[in-house]
């Protein structure tokens, strides 16, 4: 009989009480969506000495691959081996397991960037992971992946994915958002002594502007920003390459479902066109405005998208605050 190793993982701490329940709501789903899921048993949320932990058992000893994947979870913090007792000492007893997620740029890059309507950076990391886990590239290193946010706003998705190690590209129609994001990248890299090369260009035929950043010296990542219409994403991102993942948080300023449906109706076919086969899109939205069934029907109209609605992807709805009482997440694969 194969022995098991019991693990207790702290929930990721949140900077704001506004998001205090975020990890509690989503940590189990993130773990069960990951490549680790087939090796896990008895996954449950519990409390040890008044602190919340996600507890589970792993078949056999904990491996380096286990630790690498656990360290990359957005909703988990410190990782511990859990003992009911050791010798005559009764538990629960915790043994810390060294686990760190390497960052290409400091993880505070996403946290430092402040702007109106910003999406929580821990949740953004979660979205990136859920897209990756649903794709054919779930076990790939982030350094091998390209991530696009076609509604990037102030850039939280870009900076989260860049920190993980991906090449990134973002589009937004708001001039202030894009220009201030380009300025922030330049200032942040200068202040943190991160090598940076940049170029700005005009795409006159498309009525758009692009900023191209090369971040790093020997180990380089690309960051492309585009001021333009997300519905023309394949044209605007020419030269970036087809992304493995598309990750975005749909705008909450849309007060009625019809404009949101119109936006997605215009954009989804182009997004599917540029996504690599086996890639995935993950997006969140205010589901009090447009319910999950209606959103699934909308995405389902794009023949090349296969909606991932198996557990745990079908239970990602959660409360955000008094304004957004219910936010949901939908993930779809590119056939």
Where do the language-model regions lie?
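Class I S-adenosyl-L-methionine-dependent methyltransferase catalytic core
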Residues: 2-32, 70-76, 86-148, 152-335
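Short secondary-structure junctions
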Residues: 35-40
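Short beta-strand
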Residues: 43-49
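A generic structural motif
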Residues: 50-61, 330-332
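Terminal-region recognition feature
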Residues: 52, 64-74
């Amino acid at each position: 009989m194969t022995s098991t190793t019991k693990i207790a993982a702290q929930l990721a701490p949140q900077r704001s009480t506004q998001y205090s329940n975020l990890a509690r709501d989503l940590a189990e789903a993130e773990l069960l969506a990951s490549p680790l899921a087939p090796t896990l048993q008895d996954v449950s949320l519990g409390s040890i000495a008044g602190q919340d932990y996600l507890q589970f058992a792993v078949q056999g000893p904990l491996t380096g691959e286990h630790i690498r994947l656990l360290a990359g979870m957005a909703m988990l913090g410190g990782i511990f081996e859990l003992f009911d007792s050791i010798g005559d000492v009764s538990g629960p007893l915790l043994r810390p397991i060294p686990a760190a997620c390497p960052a290409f740029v400091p993880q505070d890059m996403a946290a430092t960037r402040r702007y109106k309507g910003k999406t929580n950076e821990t949740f953004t990391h979660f979205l990136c992971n859920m897209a990756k886990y649903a794709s054919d590239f779930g076990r790939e290193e982030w350094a091998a992946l390209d991530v696009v946010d076609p509604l990037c706003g102030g850039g939280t998705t870009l900076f989260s994915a860049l920190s993980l190690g991906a090449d990134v590209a973002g589009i937004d129609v708001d001039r202030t958002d894009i220009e201030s994001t380009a300025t922030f990248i330049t200032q942040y890299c200068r202040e943190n002594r991160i090598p940076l090369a940049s170029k700005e260009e005009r795409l006159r035929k498309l009525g758009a502007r692009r900023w191209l950043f090369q971040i790093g010296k020997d180990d380089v990542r690309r960051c492309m920003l585009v001021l333009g219409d997300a519905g023309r994403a394949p044209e605007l991102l020419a030269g970036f390459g087809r992304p493995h993942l598309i990750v975005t948080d749909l705008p909450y300023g849309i007060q009625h479902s019809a404009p949101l449906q119109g936006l997605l109706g215009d954009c989804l076919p182009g997004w599917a066109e540029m996504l690599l086969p086996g890639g995935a899109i993950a997006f969140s939205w205010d589901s009090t405005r447009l319910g999950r069934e209606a959103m699934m029907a909308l995405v389902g109209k794009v023949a090349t998208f296969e909606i991932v609605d198996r557990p745990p992807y079908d239970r990602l709805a959660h409360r955000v605050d008094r304004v957004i009482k219910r936010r949901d997440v939908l993930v779809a694969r590119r056939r």
